[in-house]
Amino acid sequence: GLIRASVTVQDKDNQRFAALGAGKRAVVVGGAGRMGQWLIRFLTDQGYEAGSLDPATALDERGWAHDALPSADLVICSAPPAATAELYAQWTSAPPAGVVADIASIKTPLIEPIRALQHAGARVASFHPMFGPSAVLLRDCDVVICDTGDAEATGTIEKLFQSTTVHVVHLPLAEHDRIMADVLSLAHATAIAFALALPDTKHVVRSTTLHALETLAANIVRESPDVYYEIQALNPYSMAALQRMRGALDRVVDAIASRNAEGFRALLHEGRTRTPGT
């Protein structure tokens, strides 16, 4: 409504007023993807001259980005972790002069490449926007900024969000994936499993609970399969989270199959201790 639109305009006005990127250049590697396009718009609002280095980008823009990359003030990799790791390995021979950062959802495959690039003299940061490319209002969104040991590079990324209403969360680089196994892997897998368990034919009546879960699951299963597979498969902590989900479902099934009303009540009580109160 009006409040949402007002806050959105205020965010953009604050970014332009701050003019953080005025006179600076930024290259987004993988900028033709949906999140890459979001980053280019975001950086442009900050005053940066920003362009995409991506095979799917128009030739003129791609050429500009290719030429700008070695001396650009900021280089953000909006590519899958494996592709970003490969780029970092290539750049160790001649690191970009500006701050290099990734937005990967999984950090484990990047830890060694980040260290190698730093050893080669690069300034490297790492962050993770906890929202998708359709996000307009950042007030209810989180951005995780990982500590790479380079305070200057990390500060550059933090300043990008200072003029917005986003909530910045700092995490050690090595802790990121352990936490994301709960925040992403568990949540996504639960939504996917719910979608797969739905009947083939729709019922004429729906509960508010079903509607809420259907809406959540519908959003998840329409995201990029490749990205969501990487979130599960490349995170070394994912399987432990998924085993917890399987164990929890088994406990529910066991309580019902054994007609254990007290056990079922205990499950709901335990669930209340793990979820926010209303």
What are these regions (language model features)?
Residues 28-29, 77, 145:
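Hydrophobic Val/Ile/Leu positions in short beta-strands of Rossmann-like dinucleotide-binding domains
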Residues 33-34, 82:
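Residue-level detector of alpha-helix initiation sites
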Residues 32, 55-56, 149:
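Residues in the short beta-alpha loop(s) of Rossmann-like NAD(P)-binding domains
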Residues 1-27, 32, 44-49:
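N-terminal hydrophobic or amphipathic helices and topogenic motifs
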Residues 170-278:
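An accessory alpha-helical subdomain
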Residues 37-38, 44-63:
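NAD(P)-binding Rossmann-fold cofactor-contacting core
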Residues 66-70, 74-117:
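Rossmann-fold NAD(P) dinucleotide-binding segment
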Residues 106-167, 171, 177-180:
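Rossmann-fold dinucleotide-binding core
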